[in-house]
Each structure stands twice: as C-alpha cells, then as structure tokens.
Swiss-Prot record:
It catalyses: RNA(n) + a ribonucleoside 5'-triphosphate = RNA(n+1) + diphosphate. Its EC number is 2.7.7.6. Mg(2+) binds at D462, D464, D466. One of its GO terms (cellular component) is DNA-directed RNA polymerase complex. Its cofactor is Mg(2+); Zn(2+). GO terms for molecular function: DNA binding; DNA-directed RNA polymerase activity; magnesium ion binding; zinc ion binding. Binds 1 Mg(2+) ion per subunit. Binds 2 Zn(2+) ions per subunit. The gene is rpoC. Keywords: DNA-directed RNA polymerase, Magnesium, Metal-binding, Nucleotidyltransferase, Transcription, Transferase, Zinc. It comes from Brucella canis (strain ATCC 23365 / NCTC 10854 / RM-666). HAMAP family: RNApol_bact_RpoC. Belongs to the RNA polymerase beta' chain family. This is DNA-directed RNA polymerase subunit beta'.
Length: 1400
C-alpha cells in the first residue's frame, strides 16, 4: 500500500524483468490491439488555438491529454478525476506522458505491400512465391494481372497478363472461368493461399533429386524462408498490410516556432500523405469511379506507404518543402544518427563538464585539480543535501540562494562533499579504456582542470589546448567502481602489452637521464662515501658534482627485512635516484645504476611493480616524476643551432655517391643495365650515402670532448641527450637537421631518384624544397583520411568481439597452439619468452638437457619461468589459447592466461573481446595520425644479403647447390634453409635462402656472428640451369613471344619475353629454353624431368641460342618490383584486409596435396598444372595459372602440401582449408604483428587470437545427417557439437562441417543477437531477416544489454547476474520442496508472496 502513496504524483508501471526479446511480423489483429483509435483526418493542430484537431494526427481523444490530468476542454482538472473520460471532448484524464506510449492506426482502403519484405534483398515475398522481384512489382504497381485461379483454362497459375492479354482471355474463356487479380490484393491472395507444410515437403524432395549447384542453392534459399515462417508462426499474408500503425505523437512532435511557423517531424508529412490518399481512395470507391482512376489512386497509396516505411528505397525520394529528403521510419533507426547508435548505444549524460587541461606536477598520481566553479556546479545536489542536513537551509530554494551567493559555509561544505568522492576524467577520442580514468578532485583556483603529467600517455594528452570532460559518479556503486577499478593508480600497466604505461616522458626523462650521466675528470673523482647524508653535504659544498665517479655505500634490506648495505661504483646523481627505490630485497641498486634512458626507466618501474606491488610503485612513480622535473629544470638543457653538427666528411661522401650515380647512368647508356635496374641502384646508393652521413654525424655528436684548460669533460651535446634518452626526437629527425634529408617519396609511394642533399641547417634549394613538399602533403592528406579508417576498424573489431567474455575458469581443452620465436631476416624479433609470458602451458615444459619440469601443464608461465626457458634455449612450447578454447559462451580464464593490465590471472567476467579490439584499434589511430612526422622521407626496405645471427656450425636443410662457372656455390633448391647449430647441436637460427642466392658457406663450416652467409640480387629473380650443356630456344619467336627492345636513350637492345597470348597466332606457344648435349639430345634433370625451362612474360634473356652453359649459370632473369616505401599506409589497409579475410588481389596458390608437378594441356590463356599425389588413393589436383605470372616450378618438381605454387600473399581461406586452424592462426597473428612491429607498436598475441577466434565461430555443414540443417548452412561450431552429442546418444546420424573463416564485418552481422547486428550495419536487412524468422534475442552480449538498458553481463554486472541466477534457482528449489512436504495451499501462497517480495 505505502508504495501507492509514494507514487501518487508519479505513478510508474513496475519495471518488468525479462530474459529475451522476440521480433516478428505484426498481424492486423496485433496492430489493432495496440491502437487507441483510428486516425481519419490529415489535420494536425488548430493554428489559432494550438489544440489538436479531433481524429487528426495529434488527436487528444486517441493519444491522451496534452497537460497532466486535464482534459482538452478544461472541464476536468487535477488528480481527483484520474481515469475519467470527459463526455464533451472524449479525452481521458491522465498523465500527458501517455502521448509517448499510445499508438493509433489507419485503416487502408486497399492492401499495400510492406516495402521491407518486398525490396530488402533477397525479397522475402519474391522468394516465397518463387517469382522475380520485377514481376511482383509489375503486379503491385498495376501494370500486369496475375492469374490466381486458372480453373479449366489453358492459363497457368502465377502467369502474368498485360491489360490486353487479360481482355483477350476474358473474351476467350469468360469472366467466371478463371481469376486474375492486380495490385496488392493479388499478392495477398497468393500468399494467403500458400500451404507452407506442403511446399516445404515438396522442396525437400526436389533438393534430394536435383544435381545442379545453382538449382540447389535456389531451392535451399526458398526452403529456408518457408521453414522460417513455419517455425516462427508468422503468416505470409501479414507481409501485405491492411492496417498501418501510427506511432505516438510525442515521438513525432510538432513545435510552434515564434512568428506563427511550426517545426515538425518529417513523419507527420509522410503520415499526412498516406491519410490524404487513403481518404481520397475511399471516396472514389464510394463514388464508383472508373477502374483506371481507382487503380492510379491505389498505386499512389502504395507509394505513400512505401515512403513512410523507407523513403527512397523505391522510385524517387519524396522531399519536403526545402528539397530535403524526408526521414522515414527506417531512417530513424539507421546509421550514426539513428535510434540505435545515437540514443541507445551512446547517450548524453548530466553531471558533466569540460574545460582545458593544464599540467599539475605537484598532484599525487590519484589526484586531479578541479576548478572551484566547476566543482560547485557538478556537486550541487550533494551540497544542497549537506546544507539541509547541517541546518543552514530548510528548503531547496534557500540552499540554491546560498550556493548562488557563494557564501563561505558553501565552500566548507564543498570541501567535505568532494573528499573521497572520485570523478571521472575523459579525453576524446577515447581509443581504449585508459581514455577514461577516475581521480580524486582537489579544489583549485582558475578555470582549467589540472592533470597529473604521468597519465598523459594513457590519455594521449598534451597541454597545447586539449580539453577534457569531467563526469561525477553519483550512486554508491558507481563511486565504488570508480575507486576500485578505474582509479588512475590501478591502471599502471598497458592492457595491450602489459608494459607500464605510467612512465615519465619528455622533460622527466631528460632530467633523470642527466642525473645518471657519468663524466670523466670531475672534481672529487674516486672519493668514498658512507651514506647519503655525507654525499648530500659534499654536493652542497661543490666538492663533488652530480656526475663524479665515486664509491658509495647503498643501504637496502635482505629477505628478512634487516638493513644491509653494499658499496657500489656510482655517481652522486645515481645515488639520489637510488634513494627513491623501495627498500626490497628484489630491487637492487643496479637497476638505477645505469644510464636512465626511457627504456630503462620503464624497465625499472616494471621491476618495482612486479616485486613491490601497486602502492609502492605509485609512490615511487610520483617521486621519480618530481625528481625528473627538478633536475631537468636545474640542468637547463637547451640547444642552439651550433648543436646541430654537420659532419666534415659529408661533401666527400656526396661526391663519391654522385660519381657512382654517374657511372650507373653510363652503364645504362651503354645498355649494360635496364632503366629499372639503374633506378634501383641509384636509390640504393643514395640510401647508403644517407646512412653513412648519419653515422658520421652521430659519431660526432656522441664524441666525448675535454676542456683543454680545466681538463674536465665538456657537457654532452644537448640534442644527442634528448634523442638518446628517448625524451624527444629521433635519429631520423636529427639526420634531417644536421646530416642530409635523403630520398623523398612521391605521393604514389615511389622514391624520387634525386635525393635532398642539403639539411635544414644549411637550408634547401628551391628544387629540393619542391621535391620535399610531395611527401609532406601526402602525409597531411593521409592523416585526415586514415583517422576515419582506423576508427571504423576499431568499431568493427569491437562489434565482432563484444561478446567474448571470461565466463568460466577452465574449459578443459586439450588442444592449443605451438609458440616459436619469430625470426625475421635472421634477427629474432620476438623471443619465445616474450611470446609465452603470461600464458598457460598446455603440456609440461621440460628442460632439454636435464629433463626436469620447468612449468607443469596447466600452470601460468611467469617471469621467473621465462628466464629459465630462455637460458635452456627451448625453441617450441605448446600453450593454451583463446582460439582453441572450448567454452560455450565466451572464453575460459586458463586459455586466456594473464590479465595484462593487472599482471595476475584474468578474472571471471572480464570483457576480453573489447579489450582486444581496443588494443588493436588504438595504435591504428595513433599510427595514422603520425605518418607525416617523417616529413615524407623515404625508407627503403629491401635486404640483399644474410648475416649469421649466432656463432655455430652450418647445416643445410634440403641441400641443393651447384658450383657455377665463377666457382661460387649457388642455391638451386626452392625450399632450402641454412641452419646454425650451437655446440650442443641445437638449432639457434633458421634462415630461408632463396633460389639463385650465392652461398659463402657449406655444410659443416663454422661461422662467427655477423659473418655473411649468402647474398642475392633483390631486384631480379634468376632462372638457372642445373646441367651443363648447350642452350636452345623453343617457341621464342621474334615479334610474337620475344621482342628486341632498344632503349630509347642508349640504343642498346635486350631481348625480352612479351605477352604471346595477345595475338591469335601465339596462343599455343610455350616459350622455353632447353639444354641439350653435343648430340642435340635434351638433357635430364636430377628429378627426372627434361631440362626445359619455361619463361614468363617480362623475362630478360641472358644467353644466346647455342651458348655453352655450366650448372648454376643464369640463363634468364625476371625483374622484380622496384623498392617502394613502407609506411603504415600500407599497414592499416593490410590489417583491415587480414581481419576482413579478403582474398588478396594476386593471391598465392597453395598446393593441397604432396606430390609431383606435371604440366597439363594449356587452357586459353591459363597454364594447367597437375599435382600427381604420392598416395594413389587421392585424386590428382589441377590448378590453372595465368600465363606470364612469374612461375618457378618445373615439370617433375616434388612439392609438399602447403607449398606455394604461385608466389604472393596467400588467401587465409586457403590456409584454413589446407593446413588447418593452427596454421591459419599463426599466419594471421604473424602478419598482423608484422605491420605493428614495423611501427614499433607492441601488442600481445592473445588479443589477435581473441579476434580470430570470433572469426572462426562458424562451420559450414557438409553432411547434414539428422541435424535438420541443410548442407551449406552456417552453424555455430559449439552448437553443432552439442547437437551431434545428443544425436549420437539417441543413436541417430550426426552432421559434420568444415570450419569457415568469416571477415569481422560478416561475423558481426551473423551474431545470434539481432539487436547487436541491427545496431552495427545494414539495420533494415537485419531486422527484416529477424522478423521473418521470428528471432529471439537472449541478451547474451554487451551491446544488446546496453540497448535495453540493463547492466552488461561483464565485470560487476556479470557478478550481479550470476548472483541473481543463483538466487532464482535457490528460490525455485525451496518452493518445490515446500510443495512436496506441505500440501496446504495457504502455505504455498504465503511462500510465493514472500519470494516475490524478496525478488522485488
């Protein structure tokens, strides 16, 4: 009862709890049941009285009163008449809020088709009737009749008749012998008369009988829709509407503007058109107007309803008075401005403010400075409450006055209110979760928010005018979450890679670096100090400087916590820093007794965090920040133009390179090299020159100089200090200031041959300046475009991964991934330790020598284990992965491993999918914003040699080499590798060497680190002979397949293979070179094939017919693409391409089986390759390869499954089909990582794995068994496994399927939740599909729950849901028990009441 009294003034319906939402097609009865009355007039409101017109679009009688508890004519006012219907104006006396809820309807005089089911492809009506969309439209828009009942005539059912044909048929057969209808009535009749069960049975029979793929697809599509209708209980004829619902008037408001005009929602215009046409049609029917006029009116009615539902989907767009298209109901839902994304997924919130940020170096890490004015406004309700409680005011009005006058007691109360009440700070764009963090406010004067310098990295903030928003968490729960989970002190590590993100940068780094410098010959060198006190004394009296080499005792503690001390060689500066280290046995002085570059500082903070915990780390960070600032200020480091040193040898290096380029120019003129080769060599030469000048410059800057008078060391070069410490600037930028700017790129990505020889200190010539504007402009244009692209990528990633949540502790999976170190060009880019840290071991990890267990199976690999693993030199470890996790909804904690942002095993309910998406998307934006910082300077990425990365013994895997006529060893194998073994015979490095490389070592040789192993020409790919003999040409016909091209500038000719398929005469040619012996017999190769070498287009012939060649000699060469600059520009689209699982343009062709290569008959302009399997039970596989693609296999080559037949980027689908899930995972992870690694961005593999897991959720049914699926259906992998288990138990036939890889957009749209899919993309299509199938959304993921306004099932929300579930289950158990024991109804009733109350 007391609830009623409480809610007297604002009665609200109790919120209904629900577990799922269903969408289906509304039947006419349903629409009528929603409606409160029919709308008969198109009028809206009376322009004089501003009162709604009766029976109009805003009618108060239908939709409810305009003012609370007041009828329209004013006869009944106030609460006491609640629920009475006024007899004069017919308005119910109730809240005006019902105008947001009550719907009306329009009775249509003729049925119309619902445009969504008609035009949304595939057209549901069309598929169901098995007619084309064109035909249906002809009927609907009154062009053709359709036969619904042929009777005994020769007409067929569904036959279309034009007006004339219809008349002829009527004359011929008589009007009552058959029925043919026109318009939506016809379609309605056809749909209503469908017997779905019978059609479904017929389709199944047809499916079983048909053999053609196309027909099967068509039948399957139709069967699916028929089954959807059967299962959902929707009727097909409901897709034709006889009644149109009208949405509540407050959702399509009409607002009077000053000056007697009105602003109205577009929907009112659209509804008005429908009502006008409908009323006109009714009148015409009453008047018995001629058929043609009625038909025209019906067609116009259909168009009006179409425009109301989806304007512009069919015909021309209906525009308003200002030529702007009207927003239809579909447009209200669609896109960024639609209902889903604008109002449901993101809302504007109150209790927020924004202001400019300034730095607050005296704040603690958990604090922020909040301007008093802002705090007063934000915390108003709290202040009012406190003023009331303390008796300063008795009403809100008084409190308001006090606050407005800013009385002194208000400020005291504000202090109390703010104490311990965290606020959230957010900087847009919020690219990852660290873009919103909680701080404790401290009140400050002024109008700018103060931000702690150490959190700037996380927010990506700087103080050049950035603004930030402040939000106040109101409820106790929100304050608790802000404090416990979002406080800046809890976000020390980066969620993407687990490294500290609270790291000093810029000035702080410079200060700490300056503090840690050691200088020679400083005063007091070699002195010994007992403790910090003495040292401080000496410093103050200038006996020593910060950089003097000294010995000093450093005090720390041992494992029991007793003080111990040890003497170190160090400097006073480093001792000052050492004093700040937490006293802990695991934190030795050594970690700050070194040059404090940014990397080392980061390592130091990481070390302190791992060993001393969060609290100590936060205090330590604050202290080193203050120390850094203090000493950066004291040191006074700055630089002038003379600090940019131009190396003396610059002129000499430039002159030498210019001489080289002249020489290449000459070689080109003499015809020794091609234009392309010349270009590559010139670019190469200038690249090397730039590097050389840079090296010289850096050497000059690094050099230590001594003052001849005092003998003391001069201060280091300031610019070098800034760059080397990692505070600001890079070698690249210094090179442009003091070396030479180097090569520039054109906007197309090619490199301009003439470099910029000057640097910024000397100044550029006009030509150089012009050349360099190219790259700079491209950078600026790219930035603008790519920010959007990167944001879109993040959005797709979040959408596909949003429901990957940690939902259980251990799924018990017995499969996983194999981790190996990543080696790139012989360098280890990611060690095995880095890759397995924080992952769960799948099998026990054993020491390779002693065999002892380092990590047991199922335990997480920690830092200490990694050290042992790296020392033991283990090369391959099996770990658990999210990709192979067997949890039904979400991922299990064991498969995921460590929560990188906390450094502990991941908690249940953590939204790992969203974290993964943010970790991958955030650097994308960063990188795209940073392209132009290089000023468009080109970096050539091409290697042409291989150096040993370790000492050891050489072993050649798949050895296949010959000595050529120059006496060099040449690699003849396609898949040969050079292995370097250490003393114990373990592989330390594996280098792939390409076909045609020159080898400098052979099996069993020992190599030193850095020794050259092999080299090759990166710009051409050679074709070499394996046997000695005489060359003969086959099918190399002048003018057809070979042309002598003379270079315009030199007149030298070279013979090049041209595209022989372009002429009809050349279509059967197979240009090749054969090697014969003296007798003219074709020689055999080692593998048994003939020594015939097929040539592809653009090959340059290197020998003449009849020439004598030795094994390993080059007989032709194929030029490669010239060097393009690598830049994340290639990177971001590449990442998107991989995640979208698109087939690359010229994708590689991969062998599906092991076998021998044979050449088959060529087909048009394709070359046919057949692989004959080694195993006779398998069929041979054929591939068609476009002629003229560089192709390196020869007849008779042995090929293994998974090897490339044609080079290029492989299509991920092929890898999945041929090599399986694990190979696909490692390919995608490595490719994506490579893009980010190039930019120096660290992302943990597990994030990419989580996304790939979401892409691999579905299987395509191949054998349906008794599952009830149709072959070709995409089904959830785990769902299929569950169904199969059930079928096997029942003794039925299980189904089977192959895993399919879906791109992230496709995977997002295929989620089981239609709400989530609709809010992502293609809203109309998703909703149409869901409505036909009567889909149920069980609200499992995050987005669905945000949209319906519930706590998300992750984090604290996940726990709340879990507790609720447990409670409900427990209640049900108790009720059941009671029912069994006491049969008395009263006891039951009482108990039910009790549980209901408890639930409420």
């Amino acid at each position: 009862m007391n609830q009623e009294v409480m809610n007297l003034f604002n009665p609200q319906a109790p919120a209904q709890t629900f577990d799922s939402i269903r969408i289906s097609i509304a039947s006419p009865e349903k629409i009528l049941s929603w409606s409160y009355g029919e709308i008969k007039k198109p009028e809206t409101i009376n322009y004089r009285t501003f009162k709604p017109e009766r029976d109009g679009l805003f009618c108060a009688r239908i939709f409810g009163p305009i003012k609370d508890y007041e009828c329209l004519c004013g006869k009944y006012k106030r609460m006491k008449y609640k629920g009475i219907i006024c007899e004069k104006c017919g308005v119910e006396v109730t809240l005006s809020r019902v105008r947001r809820e009550r719907m009306g309807h329009i009775e249509l005089a003729a049925p119309v088709a619902h445009i969504w089911f008609l035009k949304s492809l595939p057209s549901r009506i069309g598929t169901l009737l098995d007619m084309t969309l064109k035909d249906i439209e002809r009927v609907l828009y009154f062009e053709n009749y359709i036969v619904t009942e042929p009777g005994l005539t020769s007409l067929k059912e569904h036959q279309l008749l034009s007006e004339e044909e219809y008349m002829i048929a009527v004359d011929e057969f008589g009007e009552d012998q058959f029925t043919a209808l026109i318009g939506a009535e016809a379609i309605y009749e056809l749909l209503a008369s469908m017997e779905l069960e019978k059609i479904a049975a017929d389709l199944r029979v047809d499916l079983a009988e048909t053999t053609s793929d196309l027909k099967q697809k068509k039948l399957m599509k139709r069967l699916k829709i028929v089954e959807n209708f059967l299962e959902s209980g929707n009727r097909p004829e409901w897709m034709i509407m006889k009644i149109v619902p009208v949405i509540p008037p407050d959702l399509r408001p009409l607002v009077p503007l000053d000056g007697g005009r009105f602003a109205t929602s577009d929907l009112n215009d659209l509804y008005r058109r429908v009502i006008n046409r409908n009323n006109r049609l009714k009148r015409l029917i009453e008047l018995r107007a001629p058929g043609i006029i009625i038909r025209n009116e019906k067609r116009m009615l259909q168009e009006a309803v179409d425009a109301l539902f989806d304007n512009g989907r069919r015909g021309r767009v209906i525009t308003g008075a200002n030529k702007r298209p009207l927003k239809s109901l579909s447009d209200m839902l669609k896109g960024k401005q639609g209902r889903f994304r604008q109002n449901l997924l993101g809302k504007r919130v109150d209790y927020s403010g924004r202001s400019v940020i300034v730095t607050g170096p005296e704040l603690k890490l958990h604090q922020c400075g909040l301007p008093k004015k802002m705090a007063l406004e934000l915390f108003k309700p709290f202040i009012y409450a406190r003023l009331d409680a303390k008796g300063y005011s008795s009403t809100v009005k008084q409190a308001k006055k006090l606050v407005e006058k800013e009385r002194p007691e208000v400020w005291d109360i504000l202090d109390e209110v703010i104490r311990e009440h965290p606020v959230l700070l957010n900087r847009a764009p919020t690219l990852h979760r660290l873009g919103i963090q909680a701080f404790e406010p401290t009140l400050i004067e002024g109008k700018a928010i103060q931000l702690h310098p150490l959190v700037c990295t996380a927010f990506n903030a700087d103080f050049d005018g950035d603004q930030m928003a402040v939000h106040v968490p109101l409820s106790l729960e929100a304050q608790l979450e802000a404090r416990v989970l979002m406080m800046s002190t809890n976000n020390i590590l980066h969620p993407a890679n687990g490294a500290p993100i609270i790291v000093p940068s810029q000035d702080m780094v410079l200060g700490l670096y300056y503090l840690s410098i050691v200088a020679e010959k400083e005063p007091g060198e070699g002195m010994i100090f007992a403790d910090m006190g003495e040292l401080q004394h000496a410093l103050e009296n200038k006996v020593v400087t910060l950089h003097t080499k000294i010995k000093s005792r450093f005090k720390t503690v041992d494992a029991e916590g007793n003080p111990v001390s040890k003497i170190y060689d160090t400097t006073p500066g480093r001792m000052i820093m050492g004093e700040l280290l937490p006293k802990n046995v695991n934190v030795p002085f050594d970690i700050c007794n070194q040059e404090m570059t940014k990397k080392n500082i980061s390592k130091m903070i990481d070390h302190v965090y791992r060993h001393c915990g969060q609290k100590e780390t936060v205090i330590f960070c604050d202290r080193i920040m203050q120390l850094g600032f203090a000493h950066a200020c004291r040191a006074g480091i700055s630089f002038g133009k003379d600090d940019m040193v131009i190396p003396e040898s610059k002129a000499k290096i430039v002159a030498e390179t210019e001489a080289l380029t002249t020489e290449y120019e000459q070689q080109y003129n003499d015809g020794l090299i091609t234009q392309g080769e010349k270009y590559n060599k010139v670019v190469d030469a200038w690249g090397k020159a730039t590097d050389k000048i840079t090296e010289e410059m850096m050497a000059r800057l690094k050099a230590v100089e001594f003052d001849p008078v005092t003998g003391r060391q001069k201060q280091m070069n300031s610019v070098y200090m800034m760059s080397h410490s990692g505070a600001r600037g890079s070698v690249n930028q210094m090179r442009q200031l003091g070396g030479m700017r180097g090569l520039m790129a054109k906007p197309s990505g090619e490199i301009i041959e003439t470099p910029i020889i000057s640097n910024f200190k000397e100044g550029l010539t006009v030509n150089e300046y012009f050349n360099s504007t190219h790259g700079a402009r491209k950078g600026l244009a790219d930035t603008a475009l790519k920010t959007a692209n990167s944001g879109y990528l993040t959005r797709r990633l979040v959408d596909v991964a949003q429901d990957a949540i940690i939902s259980e502790v251990d799924c018990g999976a017995e499969i996983g991934l194999t981790m190996q170190p990543i080696v790139d060009a012989g360098q280890i880019v990611a060690s095995i330790g880095q890759r397995v840290l924080g992952r769960t071991a799948l099998d026990p990890i054993l020491h390779p020598v002693t065999g002892e267990v380092i990590v047991e199976a199922g335990r997480m690999i920690e830092e200490k284990d990694v050290e042992i693993i790296e020392k033991a030199g283990i090369q391959s470890i099996r770990i658990r992965s999210a990709l192979t996790c067997e949890t039904r909804d979400g991922v299990c904690a064991k498969c995921y491993g460590r929560d990188l942002a906390r450094g502990t095993p991941v908690n249940q309910g953590e939204a790992v999918g969203v974290i993964a998406a943010q970790s991958i998307g955030e650097p994308g934006t960063q990188l795209t914003m940073r392209t132009f910082h290089l000023g468009g300077t080109a970096q050539v990425v091409d290697s042409s040699y291989l150096e040993a990365s370790y000492e050891g013994t050489v072993k050649l895997r798949n050895r296949n080499v010959v000595r050529n006529s120059d006496g060099n060893l040449v690699v003849m194998g396609r898949n040969m590798a050079v292995l370097i073994l250490d003393a114990t015979g373990k592989e330390r490095a594996v280098h792939r060497v390409t076909y045609g490389s020159r080898l400098f070592v052979d099996e069993g040789d020992t190599v030193k680190r850095g020794q050259r192993i092999a080299e090759w020409d990166p710009y051409t790919r050679p074709i070499m002979t394996e046997v000695e003999g005489y060359v003969e040409f086959e099918d190399l016909v002048d003018g057809l397949s070979v042309s002598e091209t003379a270079d315009e500038s030199t007149g030298i000719t070279k013979r090049v293979v041209i595209d022989w398929r372009s002429t009809p005469r050349g279509s059967d040619l197979k240009p090749a070179m054969v090697i014969k012996d003296k007798a003219g017999k074709i020689l055999k190769l080692s593998k048994g094939g003939d020594a015939r070498f097929l040539l592809s287009v653009e090959s340059i012939l290197s020998v003449e017919p009849g020439a004598h060649v030795k094994a390993g000699d080059v007989i032709a060469r194929l030029p490669m693409e010239s060097a393009k600059t690598k830049d994340i520009t290639g990177g971001l689209p590449r990442v998107a391409e991989l995640f979208e699982a698109r087939r690359p343009k010229d994708h590689a062709i991969i062998a599906e089986i092991d076998g021998t290569v044979r050449f088959g008959r060529d087909y048009k302009n394709k070359r046919r390759i057949i692989i004959e399997p080694n195993d006779d039970t398998i069929e041979p596989v054929e591939y068609l390869i476009p002629k003229g693609k560089p192709f390196h296999l020869q007849d008779g080559d042995v090929i293994e499954k998974g090897e490339y037949i044609l080079d290029g980027n492989p299509a991920p689908h092929d890898i999945l089909a041929i090599k399986g899930v694990e190979a696909l995972a490692s390919y995608l992870v490595n490719e994506i990582q490579e893009v980010y690694r190039l930019q120096g961005v660290l992302i943990n593999d597990k994030h990419i794995e989580v996304i790939v897991r979401q892409m691999l959720q579905k299987v395509e049914i191949t054998e349906s068994g008794d599952t009830g699926y149709i072959p070709g259906d995409h089904v959830d992998r785990i769902e299929l496994e569950e169904i199969n288990e059930r079928l096997i138990e029942e003794g039925k036939k299980p189904g089977s399927g192959n895993p399919v890889l879906l791109g992230i957009t496709k995977a997002s749209l295929q989620t089981p939740s239609f709400i989530s899919a609709a809010s992502f993309q293609e809203t109309t299509r998703v909703l149409t599909e869901a409505a036909v199938a009567g889909k149920m959304d069980t609200l499992q993921g995050l987005k669905e729950n945000v949209i319906v306004g519930r706590l998300i099932p992750a984090g604290t929300g996940g726990m709340t849901n879990q507790i609720r579930r447990i409670a409900t289950a427990r209640d049900e158990l108790i009720i059941d028990e009671r029912r069994k024991t006491s049969g008395s109804a009263e006891a039951n009733a009482m108990l039910v009441d009790m549980t209901n109350n408890a639930a409420e």
